[in-house]
UniProtKB/Swiss-Prot annotation:
Organism: Corynebacterium aurimucosum (strain ATCC 700975 / DSM 44827 / CIP 107346 / CN-1)
Gene3D superfamilies: Glycogen Phosphorylase B
Record-given protein name: D-inositol 3-phosphate glycosyltransferase
Name of the gene this protein is made from: mshA
Binding site for 1D-myo-inositol 3-phosphate: 9, 20-25, 78, 110, 134, 154
Task performed by this protein: Catalyzes the transfer of a N-acetyl-glucosamine moiety to 1D-myo-inositol 3-phosphate to produce 1D-myo-inositol 2-acetamido-2-deoxy-glucopyranoside 3-phosphate in the mycothiol biosynthesis pathway.
Length: 421
């Protein structure tokens, strides 16, 4: 079995936490790796952003990343990438033709890639499996007042994919409900595949490992630590955590607390200075420490150094950071949105907050910061909870989905395109 995965707007080899790289990158790379270890041949097609990348990167046996030149290497935002859909699709088609590669299934990730996959499906007469990761209609429902709404053009493209993909893969049952409610999707075409965490990499630390992690990060040993890991964009809610920190320090100015925010700017209107300035304005610049994005091997130290990991997002299809933190033995305080109520067992492995107010977040953080036995017990339960989610299990499910897709009778391409949105 040979799979053409498409991740146009971001390479799975890019550093998560900066630019457009995030949970989707982690998902694509880890599922592809596990599929390759099951014997599935996987080529991941992405848009080249540097000439030094090379056309073909051999990641491991049976897994390659193919960098397709489509437009300039630099200077295009994600919002401008639709102008390069034709060039990118043509690049994939020419690669497969020149190297005489035949694929059995296309698996596209995100709506931009889905548009490419939709056309290639008709050209190659093979099934299309699509994973949206985020949906315009859902993001618009949950966006903040000063967030730019997703465009109607994107929503139309997503509707086309819902109507025309052979199988839709989602992370949670909540995503299934979202597709049905906002896009009138058929439940028969939707399959839930829960993401996982690398439980070999993300493991609970001993007291000695926690001390070492804190020394590496320059954090005092007897200080409580709350960590945030993710892109610095409004949708991820780093400002919520900073405001909650100010509320905590106002309640108890002598509180020994450090808040570590690890991530980089994302989006045209995003800048780390926004959050640095906010911390300064609220008087917590000495409490909040900003770190640049870290590779997974270094994120382990941040999770192990933290007493709590905060995930104050306005929406998450699943919440990989929450799962990685729990695998590391750290309880999570998360917003009760999207897939986070599935990723976090409320009251057992962390707490869910049903608003984004600084007061409510300070209340939740305070509960765990001031209750060592409860927090430690939650951390222990978090490890067991995370063990239920694995990339190996997700890949096994995907392999079965691909096999099912290959058995679908593919209608005539002209008839199929005639029913486009």
């Amino acid at each position: 079995m040979r799979i053409a995965m498409i991740s146009m707007h971001t390479s799975p080899l890019e550093q998560p936490g900066s630019g457009d790289a995030g949970g989707m990158n982690v998902y694509v790379l880890n599922t592809a790796r596990q599929l390759a270890r099951l014997g599935v041949e996987v080529d991941i097609f992405t848009r080249a952003t540097r000439p030094s990348q090379g056309e073909v990167v051999d990641v491991e046996e049976r897994l390659r990343v193919i960098n397709i030149v489509a437009g300039p290497y630099e200077g295009l935002s994600k919002e401008e990438l639709p102008t390069q859909l034709a060039a990118f699709t043509g690049g994939i088609f020419n690669f497969a033709r020149c190297f005489e590669v035949d694929y059995d299934v296309i698996h596209s990730h995100y709506w931009l890639s889905g548009q490419v996959g939709w056309l290639l499906r008709d050209l190659w007469d093979i099934p299309l499996v699509h994973t949206a990761h985020t949906l315009a209609a859902v993001k618009n429902v949950h966006r903040t007042l000063d967030d730019t709404p997703e465009t109607e053009a994107r929503r139309i493209c997503e509707q086309q994919l819902v109507d025309n993909a052979d199988i839709l893969v989602v992370n949670t049952a909540q995503e299934t409900r979202d597709l049905i409610e906002h896009y009138d999707a058929s439940p028969d075409n939707i399959v839930v595949v829960s993401p996982g965490a690398d439980t070999d990499l993300y493991t609970p630390g001993t007291d000695r490992m926690t001390e070492r992690a804190r020394r590496q990060l320059g954090i005092p040993l007897h200080t409580k630590v709350v960590a945030f890991v993710g892109r610095l964009q409004k949708f991820k809610g780093p400002d919520v955590l900073i405001r909650a920190t100010a509320e905590l320090m106002e309640r108890d100015p002598d509180r020994r607390l450090r808040v570590v925010i690890c991530g980089g700017a994302s989006g045209a209107n995003s800048s780390p200075d926004t959050y640095h300035n906010l911390a300064r304005e609220l008087g917590v610049e000495r409490v909040v420490r900003f770190l640049s994005p870290r590779p997974p091997q270094e994120l382990v130290a941040i999770y192990q150094a933290a007493d709590i990991v905060a995930v104050p997002s306005y929406n998450e299809s699943f919440g990989l950071v929450a799962m990685e933190a729990q695998a590391s033995g750290t309880p999570v305080v998360a917003a009760a949105v999207g897939g986070l109520p599935i990723a976090v067992a409320d009251g057992d492995t962390g707490l869910l907050v049903h608003s984004h107010s600084a007061q409510d977040w300070a209340d939740a953080l305070e509960q765990l910061l001031d209750d060592d036995p409860r927090r430690i017990s939650m951390g222990e339960a978090a490890v067991d909870h995370a063990q239920q989610f694995s990339w190996a299990a997700a890949a096994t499910q995907l392999e079965n989905i691909y096999a099912d897709a290959m058995s679908i009778e593919i209608p005539d391409c002209h008839a199929r395109r005639a029913i486009g949105y």
